[in-house]
């Protein structure tokens, strides 16, 4: 827990979407920013709430793949662009919109040629900085945000990153320390990341809630793909219903629309905090909560706010009424033979094991059968070891 103060005029929200063209040759940086607050002026007027004489400088620095232009060098460091935006009430630019409260929204797009693409093998990052200046020209706020250019999509039923089929060699990770319980130090998190990379692990599923922000930043920097999971698990209610102990209409959230506002709020919180991390390829609605209309609507909320990522949910395996909840087939502890059988009968989606091999104690045997399957079955795209 920490407290901090903000200047009277400050950046309330920053959304950055690096959109890479299908050719992978060029990209577009789409930035949406909300500035709020009031500026003190000597002469009070009707425009006091507006941000008179406030400006923002936006700068992108990082790597550029010169090899695409035939240059001798491969990657070069440089300033990609910088832009100064003035928040004048009479500004007629399409970039800026003022609200009734005096806040300003900024929509800004910039072409980037030959970007160095982010991946687990080459986690090339750019640095976006936003400097906010008050009416006296003083820098009152400085924001630095790492961003990565990458193209993740479903193509012909296969998940691809930067035009190539991706295979997840992943683990599930609870936020827990063997020494301090739920209070995990930054040093332990860093050691986790380094250990994963040393063992050829390339992906994390944040089971079953958003983790502390630091691990997302480390995954950006070191190169680990993420399934970022929303805070939802109601294992007990559907487990009891599946054994006939309680009626199915008692499953939470199920089709009970009383739960929907709370669940959509959780999805929004999950998205808003972590939306700018290139490591996040997939949003996960939650874990082991059966199915139903509410969970389907949660998946649609993710898609509405973020069309550049996919959405995951394993629970459709137990409730097939809303197949569209998950963009991929996701199962737990399914044998290799049953994966083959399923894919032979269902060709609509790729398949991942969001939990498999149950690696506690002296276990994890025969894992090679799963890794071998990624070489022979294109639509089997890996899994995440439990625990």
Role assignments for model-derived ranges:
Residues 2-218, 222-226, 266-267, 281-282, ...:
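Secreted/periplasmic carbohydrate-active enzymes, especially glycoside hydrolases
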Residues 193-196, 203-387:
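Substrate-binding/catalytic cleft of secreted carbohydrate-active enzymes
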């Amino acid at each position: 827990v920490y407290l901090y103060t903000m200047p009277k005029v400050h950046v309330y929200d920053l959304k950055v979407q690096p959109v890479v063209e299908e050719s992978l040759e060029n990209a577009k940086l789409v930035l949406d920013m909300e500035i709020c607050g009031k500026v003190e002026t000597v002469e009070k007027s009707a425009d006091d709430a507006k941000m008179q004489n406030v400006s923002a400088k936006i700068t992108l620095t990082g790597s550029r793949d010169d090899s695409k232009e035939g240059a001798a060098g491969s990657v070069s460091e440089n300033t990609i662009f910088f832009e100064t935006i003035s928040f004048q009430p009479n500004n007629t630019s399409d970039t800026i919109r003022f609200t009734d409260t005096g806040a300003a929204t900024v929509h800004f797009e910039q072409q980037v040629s030959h970007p160095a693409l982010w991946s687990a093998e080459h986690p090339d990052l750019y640095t976006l900085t936003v400097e906010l200046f008050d009416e006296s020209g003083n820098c009152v706020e400085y924001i630095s945000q790492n961003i990565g250019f990458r193209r993740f999509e479903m193509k012909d039923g296969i998940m691809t990153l930067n035009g190539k089929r991706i295979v997840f060699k992943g683990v599930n990770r609870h936020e827990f320390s063997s020494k301090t319980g739920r209070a995990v130090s930054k040093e332990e998190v860093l050691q986790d990341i380094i250990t994963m990379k040393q063992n050829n692990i390339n992906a994390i599923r944040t089971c079953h809630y958003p983790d502390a922000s630091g691990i997302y930043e480390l995954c950006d920097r070191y190169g680990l793909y993420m399934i970022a999971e929303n805070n939802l698990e109601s294992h007990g209610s559907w487990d009891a219903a599946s054994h006939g102990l309680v009626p199915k209409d008692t499953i939470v959230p199920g089709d009970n629309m009383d739960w929907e506002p709370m669940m959509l709020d959780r999805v929004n919180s999950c998205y808003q905090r972590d939306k700018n991390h290139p490591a996040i390829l997939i949003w996960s609605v939650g874990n082991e909560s059966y199915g139903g209309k509410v969970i389907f609507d949660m998946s649609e909320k993710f898609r509405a706010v973020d069309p550049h990522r996919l959405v995951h949910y394993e629970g459709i395996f137990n409730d097939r009424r809303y197949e569209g909840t998950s963009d991929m087939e996701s199962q737990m502890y399914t044998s290799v033979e049953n994966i083959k059988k399923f894919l032979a009968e269902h060709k609509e989606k790729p398949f991942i094991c969001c939990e498999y091999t149950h690696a506690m104690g002296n276990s994890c045997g025969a894992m090679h059968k799963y890794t071998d399957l990624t070489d022979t079955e294109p639509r089997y795209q890996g899994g995440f070891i439990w625990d």
